[in-house]
């Protein structure tokens, strides 16, 4: 998620290292930095000589490139240029951005259009977009006008001779990809590490984690899912991952209070912040992008529908529902395989 929901990563201690030196054989190395309004962290258990200074530069270059594609906060990003271009003609996009949008459209369709990447205007009027946070609740008229600029049926992803295009039929429609950004970036960092021949690592960007374990290493990565509270870092459950991605979305951290609690996840159907009984959703899959898309879509659906779709789609999901002060947890059969008893 673009809005940070921290996943506690056991033994992920951020230490100072001299990354300009070539590291010794079998050394564990930590790299970290900032991107997309959150932190990124990479832990590598390496069994060959590698210059980590160069690797960190590659990671930072990729993250900068991703930000220049998808960030609504970057006025010159590809998606910002699409939003500013008030035309209904097809606009060229690259293959990576097309893949990101295709996942958004797919999961959007499967979640009854609740995951809606065209909700940029709605997100802005509620103060969670690149514009300044507002200190007043938008009027019903403002919400209605924003909804008129929203809808997955108003965009098309086109392919012509291996060239990708994105088209909107409402000139002022605004795309916001913040719900998918961390997963998108994490998958791209995975590709970099794989290309470098690194086969034992994990990557963390905000609330999304990607793990890879060497065939020679029988130990899986142990990940702790946080209990959904506003302040405490208490562990809710532990999962064991080998070559997987996990993403968590929640309603308990990114919000502001104005007469009532205003959460960052906006329901495009009502035009208001989501009124959901779910406080946390965690999804495990092979793709960080897919996990990142599904966790937000499911939280918008609410417990009953999220459970139904998780079963239908055979998703590895942990749903945490709150009733007053009591938390109720449901895990799908696929998720149970990763749980540490």
UniProtKB/Swiss-Prot annotation:
The protein's name in its UniProt record: FAD:protein FMN transferase
Organism listed in the record: Buchnera aphidicola subsp. Baizongia pistaciae (strain Bp)
Subcellular location(s) per record: Cell inner membrane
Binding-site positions, FAD: 36, 73, 114-116, 176, 182, 266
Encoding gene, per UniProt annotation: apbE
Reactions listed under catalytic activity: L-threonyl-[protein] + FAD = FMN-L-threonyl-[protein] + AMP + H(+)
Binding site for Mg(2+): 179, 292, 295-296
Gene3D superfamilies the UniProt entry points to: ApbE-like domains (3.10.520.10)
Topology in membrane: Lipid-anchor
Source taxon at top rank: Bacteria
Protein function: Flavin transferase that catalyzes the transfer of the FMN moiety of FAD and its covalent binding to the hydroxyl group of a threonine residue in a target flavoprotein such as NqrB and NqrC, two subunits of the NQR complex.
One GO cellular component term: plasma membrane
Predominant localisation class: membrane
Entry similarity comment: Belongs to the ApbE family.
SUPFAM superfamilies from the UniProt entry: ApbE-like
């Amino acid at each position: 998620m673009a809005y940070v929901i921290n996943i506690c990563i056991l033994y992920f201690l951020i230490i100072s290292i001299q990354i300009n030196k070539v590291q010794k054989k079998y050394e564990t190395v930590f790299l970290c930095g900032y991107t997309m309004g959150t932190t990124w962290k990479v832990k590598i258990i390496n069994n060959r000589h590698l210059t980590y200074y160069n690797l960190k530069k590659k990671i930072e270059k990729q993250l900068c490139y991703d930000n220049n594609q998808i960030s609504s906060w970057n006025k010159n990003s590809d998606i910002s240029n699409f939003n500013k271009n008030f035309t209904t003609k097809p606009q060229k996009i690259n293959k990576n951005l097309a893949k990101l949008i295709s996942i958004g459209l797919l999961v959007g369709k499967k979640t009854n259009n609740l995951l809606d990447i065209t909700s940029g205007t709605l997100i802005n009027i509620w103060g969670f977009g690149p514009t300044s946070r507002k200190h007043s609740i938008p009027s019903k008229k403002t919400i209605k006008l924003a909804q008129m600029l929203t809808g997955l049926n108003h965009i098309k992803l086109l392919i012509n001779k291996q060239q990708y295009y994105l088209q909107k039929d409402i000139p002022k429609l605004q795309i916001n990809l913040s719900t998918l950004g961390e997963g998108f970036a994490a998958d791209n960092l995975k590709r970099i590490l794989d290309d470098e021949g690194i086969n034992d690592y994990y990557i963390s960007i905000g609330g999304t984690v990607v793990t890879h374990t060497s065939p020679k290493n029988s130990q899986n990565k142990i990940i702790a899912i946080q209990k959904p509270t506003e302040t405490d870092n208490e562990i809710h459950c532990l999962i064991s991952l080998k070559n997987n991605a996990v993403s968590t979305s929640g309603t308990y951290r990114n919000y502001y209070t104005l007469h009532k609690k205003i959460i960052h996840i906006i329901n495009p159907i009502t035009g208001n912040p989501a009124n959901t009984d779910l406080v946390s959703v965690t999804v495990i899959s092979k793709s960080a992008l897919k996990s990142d898309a599904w966790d937000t879509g499911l939280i918008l659906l609410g417990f009953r529908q999220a459970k139904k779709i998780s079963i239908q789609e055979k998703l590895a999901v942990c749903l945490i529902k709150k009733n007053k002060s009591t938390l109720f947890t449901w895990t799908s059969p696929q998720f149970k395989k990763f749980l540490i008893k």
